[in-house]
Structure formats: C-alpha cells, structure tokens
A protein has these predicted regions:
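Conserved NAD+-utilizing ADP-ribose enzyme module
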Residues: 1-91
Length: 91
C-alpha cells in the first residue's frame, strides 16, 4: 500500500480529502504507479512537491481506526482525480 505525502515531510502526515460532512478521508493506493500518478496530478494543481511512501496495509488501517480517521483504498481499476484544494489536507 502507498500514501502520498509532502516531500521532506513524510512523518508529518499523508494526503487526505474532506468529504461533504467534513470528515477527512485518507487516500491509500494499492499500486505505487497509481500513487505516483496521483501525486503528479496534485503537483500540476499547484501543490508542493509530493512523495510516495510504502506502508503496510494493516499498520495504516489500524492507525486510521485508532485515530478515528476514515480511509479509502484505491485499486488499479479506480480513476482518481484530486478534488478542489479547499477540500484537501494532510493528516
């Protein structure tokens, strides 16, 4: 599994989007190529330089549950485009 983070700040949080209810949703990618592609789309939308890190599925999901954070796992079959910047954050 892979997360998108700010380059140089990998220990300070990963990319998340905010849903219509104000909940943060952590984006988790099954494939590294998909995470890299998403990071590139973010950078094209004037985000700072991004980095992709590998994480163990059970560790990141457990961290989400402990911190009461929602998450979404994207498969290679999913088409993912960044939402508007005001709907994003790093958690």
């Amino acid at each position: 599994m892979y997360l998108v983070t700010l380059d140089g700040k990998e220990n300070e949080g990963a990319y998340s989007a905010v849903d219509e209810f104000g909940n943060h949703i952590l984006y988790i990618f099954e494939e590294k190529d998909d995470a890299i592609r998403f990071a590139m789309l973010l950078e094209e939308d004037d985000y700072p330089k991004m980095n992709v890190i590998e994480v163990e599925e059970n560790v990141v999901i457990m961290a989400c549950k402990i911190n009461e954070c929602e998450y979404r796992i994207f498969t290679p079959n999913d088409i993912v485009v960044p939402p508007q910047q005001e709907d994003t954050n790093f958690i």
